[in-house]
Amino acid sequence: MKKEKILVLNFGGQYDQLIVRRVREMGVYAELHECDTNLSEINLDNLAGIILTGGPQSVNDSESPKADSKIFDLGVPVLGICYGHQYINYVNGGTIETPNLAEYGKTDLKVDKESCLFKDIPEESIIWMSLNKQLSLSTFRSVLPYSARFGVSIVPPFT
């Protein structure tokens, strides 16, 4: 049996290599590609999931990076981090807004340990946040009611 792999699509964020390394340290092969790589150029055998990295742009910008929307049809879980989170919402018809006050810096994170997404993350951590865009929670839920698509607007505690 071949080893499962995670496809990491880079949207221009600064943590792409760190994400790949952390996935590999968990015993899962991770492969990094630029977000606009055509899926036909990627070996999708044994694909277990996809991670969409962060990036400095907003999906609302006409020149912002885009991925092949067929990634959502591959039948594997997709995790969007920061920009990747916005992108999942955007591709599925959601909207992204600019809040009145943008913030960046360290903050405390408290997670629900019952969520499969956070089960191996400490209940409390200090994380980096970059909040200059927001999604409406009701929009995100109505766009993706029952799917293995996750998004976080923080840089998870990789270090």
Q: Which residues are covered by each model-predicted region?
A:
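Pocket-forming structural segment of enzyme catalytic cores
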Residues: 65-81, 86-159
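Flexible gly/pro-rich beta->alpha loop and the following alpha-helix that scaffold active-site loops
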Residues: 2-8, 13-80, 85-86, 92
